[in-house]
């Protein structure tokens, strides 16, 4: 029965009767045969399409409208090896936006703006309009210049305050050191024991007591310069007079400068003195000095 149908409808096919019979043999169903014989459009017969893969890609790219694209611009770049690569710029990057130009002021304009800034740091209203007209500038340029100038002034003030604080801390430390020097806690060097014993002997023989005079306002030091050809006296200047009204204490270093200091008696309390290591010296000379005085 299928053969009869094919024979009746074969004139409709014309030259393609042989191809229709081949399709019937391949598919083996009547419905497929009827569908293949009904229409001869390009959609039903994709074999007759002559479009290449390259042309299909071009059609896909052309179908996309520039408004729907997710990129701003595509740039073809050829690298050193000769390979062409495509760089896709994001949509948020606006390359067509005009760049802002920097305003270059003349010397006369800067001089006038600086004068106005020294007079008033905030120029608004008619003053700004008049100043912009006189300097041949826009009000926006004048306003931005004043904003930048105020920012620069704040930075300079903060930098100056930091320098002042550092110098103040250094001067405070110097005053503390000088105060300790005046109080005799750093460089107070007592007289050698043989000199003290000679002064005591002279005081007892004359009956006037000891020759060491102490007052409530000064440190206990020798009032007269000790005899000797190599005696050296040092007086610390009072640079911290505003902080401490105490008078400077004279220090006496008997002997030559390069000869070194004499030993310090163990009974003299130095506390946190700079000469504390000298208290650990040998006490043989002190013992001999005591025997000579007795």
UniProtKB/Swiss-Prot annotation:
UniProt-annotated location(s): Nucleus
InterPro entries: EMX-VAX-Noto_Homeobox_TFs, HD, HD_metazoa, Homeobox_CS, Homeodomain-like_sf, HTH_motif
Record field: compositional bias (Basic and acidic residues): 1-10, 154-165, 279-288
Span list, region Disordered: 1-27, 43-65, 149-168, 190-223, 272-294
DNA-binding region: 98-157
PROSITE patterns recorded: HOMEOBOX_1, HOMEOBOX_2
Keywords recorded for this protein, A-Z: Developmental protein, DNA-binding, Homeobox, Nucleus, Transcription, Transcription regulation, Wnt signaling pathway
GO function terms (MF aspect): DNA-binding transcription factor activity, RNA polymerase II-specific; RNA polymerase II cis-regulatory region sequence-specific DNA binding
Annotated Low complexity bias: 197-219
Gene Ontology cellular-component annotations: nucleus
Highest rank taxon of the organism: Eukaryota
GO annotation (BP), single: central nervous system development
Function: Transcription factor that may function in dorsoventral specification of the forebrain. Regulates the expression of Wnt signaling antagonists.
Name of this chain's protein: Ventral anterior homeobox 2b
Record gene name: vax2-b
């Amino acid at each position: 029965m299928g053969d009869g149908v094919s024979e009746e409808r074969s004139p409709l096919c014309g030259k393609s009767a042989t191809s229709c019979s081949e399709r019937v043999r391949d598919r083996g169903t009547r419905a497929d045969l009827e569908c293949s014989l009904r229409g001869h459009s390009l959609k039903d017969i994709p074999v007759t399409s002559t479009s290449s893969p390259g042309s299909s890609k071009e059609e896909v790219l052309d179908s996309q409208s520039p408004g729907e694209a997710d990129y701003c611009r595509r740039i073809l770049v050829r690298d050193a090896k000769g390979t062409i690569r495509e760089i896709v710029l994001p949509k948020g990057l606006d390359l067509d936006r005009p760049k802002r130009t920097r305003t270059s002021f003349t010397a006369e304009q800067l001089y006038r703006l600086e004068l106005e800034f020294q007079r008033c740091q905030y120029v608004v209203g008619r003053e700004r309009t008049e100043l912009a007209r006189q300097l041949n500038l826009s009000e926006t340029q004048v306003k931005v210049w004043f904003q930048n100038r105020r920012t620069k002034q704040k930075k300079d003030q903060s930098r100056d305050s930091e320098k002042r604080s550092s110098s103040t801390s250094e001067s405070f430390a110097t005053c503390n050191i000088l105060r300790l020097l005046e109080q005799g806690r750093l460089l107070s060097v007592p007289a050698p024991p043989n000199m003290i014993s000679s002064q005591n002997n002279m005081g007892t023989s004359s009956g006037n007591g000891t020759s060491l005079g102490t007052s409530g306002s000064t440190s206990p030091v020798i009032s007269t310069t000790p005899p000797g050809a190599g005696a050296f006296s040092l007086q610390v200047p009072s640079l911290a007079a505003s902080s401490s009204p105490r008078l400077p204490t004279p220090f006496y270093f008997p002997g030559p400068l390069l000869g070194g200091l004499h030993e310090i008696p163990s009974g003299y309390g130095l506390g946190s003195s700079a000469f504390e290591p000298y208290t650990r010296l040998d006490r043989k000379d002190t013992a001999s000095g005591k025997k000579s005085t007795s």
